[in-house]
C-alpha cells in the first residue's frame, strides 16, 4: 500500500484471489469458438485468438525471470543492491499477474470494438516502424514527465510510494502499482498499438511483440543484477541513450530523484536528471564484488521433498515459497505443474544455491540437492545421492565455508553414517560437518510440557533418539517403549545407572508421545484423548487425530537481525528455522572447532545456551513452559 492510499488503489478483483482468472474465461472461450468455427482463414481473428496464449506465455515468462533473478542474486557477484528482502515485500508483490489479466481484458475489448483489429495479419513492417517511432517519441517522453509528476509529494504519498516501498527490486517489482496508476500506464503504452489499429498497420507480431518488449525491459530494469555486456556500448555508443541497464534503474529506487526514464535514458540526459554515479555503478557491478566478500561461511545442505516442493523452493513461485509447504490453496495446480518440472531435475548433476542470508557478519547459504525424498529411500538411488552430497561437501570446502549442516535426509545413517563418512574419507577436511543433533534434542525437550514424569518413545532407532533418551534419563523422566527392538538397541548404549529409567511397556497411556520416523496412523489411534505428539524427526508425523496436540518438528525462531529471509523452510512458519539448520549457524558464530557428526555430539546444554545467547528463541506452535523451563526457554 502507498503511505496514504488514494482512490482506486485496490484492483477491482482484489478479493477474488486466484479466481480472478475466471474474468478472462468467457472471452477466451468465445474467441476460441470463433476461431475454430470460422468458415475461412480470412474470417479468423488472429489477434483476438492470440490473447489467451499470450497471457499464458507472459505468465511463464515472468516466472522464468523470477527464477533466473533469484538464482543470480543468491550467488552472483554482480548483484547491485545487497540489502535484505522481507516477507512484507513478497506479500505486496504477490499480485504481479494482475497487469497481465488487465492486458488480456483490454485486448479483448479492443478486438470487439475496433473492426480494424479483427483482420490483423501476422506481420506488418509499417506497423513495426510506427510502433518503434511512437514508443521512442511520445511514449517515452510522456512517461518521463508522468513519472516526475508521480514523485510530487501528493501523488507519491497516494500512489507511487507503493512501488517505491521495494528498495531491493525483483523483476516483478516493475509491475507493482496501485490500480489507478497502472491504468494511466496502460493508456500511455496503448498509444503505439491503438495507432497501428487505427491506421490499419497492426499485426499479430507487432502487437504481441510490443508486449514482450515491455515485459523484457521492465524485468531487466528491476532484476537487481547487472547483465548488460559492456561490448554493446562499445560497438554502438548511442545505445547508452536508448537502453537502460539494471544498475541505472536501481539508482532510481535508492536515490528516488534521479533516472526517471522508462527504458531510454536519453530523456534523463536531456533534462539533467541522470544520476552522476550511473556509469560508476554500472562499471563496478559489471566487474563484480570481491570474492571474499560474498563467499559463504555456513552452508545448509537440504533437498527437495515432494514434487510440489519444486515450486516451494525460493527459485519457484515467490508467493508459494513465502508460506509453509502445503499452505497454498492451489495445490492441485502445483501438482500439475510439478509433473512437468520434476523430470527436468534429473538433468542436474550437482547442487544449486537457492538462498543467501546474513547474520552477524556471517554469510549463510542454502544449497539444494535436486532429488526428492523418494530418491533417498530408494536403494537403487542411494549411491547416486551419496555422491551428490559428497560433491557438495567438497564444493563447500572449496568455497571457503567453515561449517556445512546436513538437513533432512542428507544425514541418514545408512547413507553416510550421519555425515561421518565424509570426515573419514577426507581427514583433513577444513569445513566442519554438523548434523545438529544436540540443538534438535534441546528443542524437543523444550516442547515437552513441564511436570511430565514419563514419555512414550516411538520411531526408528537413530542418533537423535539415543541422545534424546539419554537426556530424558538424566532428568529422571521415565522413557517407555512398546517396540522391543528399539528398546534393546537404546538400552545397550546407555550406562547401567541410566537404564532404570528405560521401560519396555505394552501400554500407550503416556500423555506425551515422542514420535520419530516410521510412526503409523494405527499407532496414533491408540493414544489417549489430549495426548501431545512431539516429533523428534526431520519430518512431521501425519496428523491422524483431531483430539490430540501435534507439535512442530524441532525448530527455533531466528534473531531479528537475521537478514534476507523471505521464504519458509519446508512446513515451518515464517522466520522459523529447523534446529538442524540453526545448529550450523550457532557452530560458526561460536567458532567451535569440532565436527558434530557420526557419534560426535556437541552437547545439548552447550548448544541450547549458545543458541539463546546468539538471539535464537524457542519455538513451539503450542506455547507452554518446557520440562526444564528457566523463564527464557532454557534447559
Curated annotation (Swiss-Prot):
Family annotation (Pfam families): CER1-like_C, FA_hydroxylase
Domain Fatty acid hydroxylase: 139-273
GO molecular function, one term: oxidoreductase activity
Subcellular compartments: Endoplasmic reticulum membrane
Topology term for the membrane: Multi-pass membrane protein
GO biological process, one term: response to water deprivation
Subunit structure of this chain's protein: Homodimer.
Protein name: Very-long-chain aldehyde decarbonylase GL1-6
Amino acid at each position: 500500500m502507498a503511505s496514504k492510499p488514494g482512490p482506486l488503489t485496490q484492483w477491482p478483483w482484489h478479493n477474488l484471489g486466484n479466481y480472478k482468472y475466471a474474468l478472462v474465461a468467457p472471452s477466451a472461450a468465445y474467441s476460441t469458438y470463433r476461431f475454430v468455427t470460422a468458415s475461412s482463414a480470412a474470417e479468423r481473428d488472429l489477434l483476438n485468438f492470440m490473447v489467451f496464449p499470450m497471457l499464458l506465455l507472459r505468465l511463464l515468462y515472468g516466472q522464468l525471470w523470477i527464477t533466473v533473478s533469484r538464482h543470480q542474486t543468491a550467488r552472483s557477484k554482480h548483484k547491485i543492491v545487497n540489502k535484505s528482502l522481507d516477507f512484507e515485500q513478497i506479500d505486496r508483490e504477490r499480485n504481479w499477474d494482475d497487469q497481465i489479466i488487465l492486458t488480456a481484458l483490454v485486448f479483448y475489448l479492443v478486438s470487439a470494438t475496433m473492426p480494424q483489429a479483427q483482420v490483423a495479419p501476422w506481420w506488418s513492417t509499417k506497423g513495426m516502424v510506427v510502433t518503434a517511432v511512437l514508443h521512442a517519441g511520445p511514449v517515452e517522453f510522456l512517461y518521463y514527465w508522468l513519472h516526475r509528476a508521480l514523485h510530487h509529494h501528493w501523488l507519491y504519498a497516494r500512489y507511487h510510494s507503493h512501488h517505491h516501498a521495494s528498495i531491493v527490486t525483483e523483476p516483478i517489482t516493475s509491475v507493482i502499482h496501485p490500480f489507478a496508476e497502472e491504468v494511466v500506464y496502460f493508456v500511455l503504452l496503448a498509444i503505439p498499438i491503438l495507432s497501428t489499429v487505427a491506421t490499419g498497420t497492426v499485426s499479430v507480431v507487432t502487437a504481441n511483440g510490443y508486449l514482450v518488449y515491455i515485459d523484457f525491459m521492465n524485468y531487466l530494469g528491476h532484476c537487481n543484477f547487472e547483465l548488460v555486456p559492456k561490448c554493446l556500448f562499445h560497438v554502438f555508443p548511442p545505445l547508452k541513450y536508448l537502453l537502460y541497464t539494471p544498475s541505472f534503474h536501481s539508482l532510481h529506487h535508492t536515490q528516488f530523484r534521479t533516472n526517471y526514464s522508462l527504458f531510454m535514458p536519453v530523456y534523463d540526459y536531456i533534462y539533467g536528471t541522470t544520476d552522476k554515479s550511473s556509469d560508476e555503478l554500472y562499471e563496478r557491478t559489471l566487474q563484480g564484488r570481491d570474492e571474499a566478500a560474498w563467499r559463504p561461511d555456513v552452508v545448509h545442505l537440504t533437498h527437495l521433498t515432494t514434487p510440489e516442493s519444486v515450486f516451494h523452493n525460493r527459485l519457484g513461485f515467490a508467493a508459494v515459497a513465502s508460506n509453509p509447504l502445503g499452505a497454498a490453496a492451489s495445490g492441485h495446480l502445483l501438482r500439475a505443474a510439478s509433473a512437468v518440472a520434476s523430470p527436468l531435475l534429473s538433468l542436474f548433476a550437482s547442487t544449486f544455491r537457492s538462498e543467501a542470508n546474513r547474520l552477524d557478519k556471517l554469510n549463510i547459504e542454502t544449497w539444494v540437492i535436486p532429488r526428492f525424498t523418494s530418491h533417498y529411500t530408494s536403494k537403487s538411488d542411494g549411491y547416486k545421492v551419496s555422491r551428490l552430497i559428497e560433491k557438495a561437501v567438497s564444493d563447500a570446502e572449496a568455497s571457503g565455508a567453515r561449517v556445512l549442516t546436513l538437513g533432512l535426509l542428507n544425514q541418514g545413517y545408512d547413507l553416510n553414517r550421519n555425515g561421518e563418512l565424509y570426515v573419514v574419507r577426507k581427514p583433513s577436511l577444513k569445513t566442519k560437518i554438523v548434523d545438529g543433533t544436540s540443538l534438535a534434542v534441546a528443542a524437543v525437550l523444550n516442547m515437552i510440557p513441564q511436570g511430565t514424569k514419563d514419555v512414550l518413545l516411538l520411531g526408528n532407532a537413530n542418533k537423535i533418539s539415543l541422545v534424546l533418551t539419554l537426556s530424558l534419563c538424566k532428568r529422571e523422566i521415565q522413557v517407555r517403549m512398546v517396540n522391543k527392538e528399539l528398546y534393546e538397541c537404546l538400552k545397550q548404549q546407555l550406562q547401567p545407572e541410566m537404564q532404570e529409567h528405560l521401560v519396555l511397556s505394552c501400554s500407550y497411556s503416556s500423555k506425551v508421545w515422542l514420535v520419530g520416523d516410521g510412526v503409523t496412523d494405527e499407532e496414533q489411534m491408540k493414544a489417549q484423548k489430549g495426548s501431545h505428539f512431539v516429533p523428534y524427526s526431520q519430518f512431521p508425523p501425519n496428523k491422524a487425530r483431531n483430539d490430540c496436540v501435534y507439535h512442530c518438528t524441532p525448530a527455533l525462531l531466528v534473531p531479528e537481525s537475521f537478514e534476507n529471509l523471505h521464504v519458509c523452510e519446508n512446513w515451518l512458519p515464517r522466520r522459523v528455522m529447523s534446529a538442524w539448520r540453526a545448529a550450523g549457524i550457532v557452530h560458526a558464530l561460536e567458532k567451535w572447532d569440532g565436527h558434530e557428526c557420526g557419534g560426535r555430539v556437541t552437547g545439548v546444554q552447550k548448544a541450547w545456551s549458545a543458541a539463546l545467547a546468539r538471539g535464537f528463541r524457542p519455538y513451539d506452535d503450542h506455547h507452554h513452559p518446557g520440562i526444564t523451563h528457566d523463564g527464557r526457554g532454557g534447559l
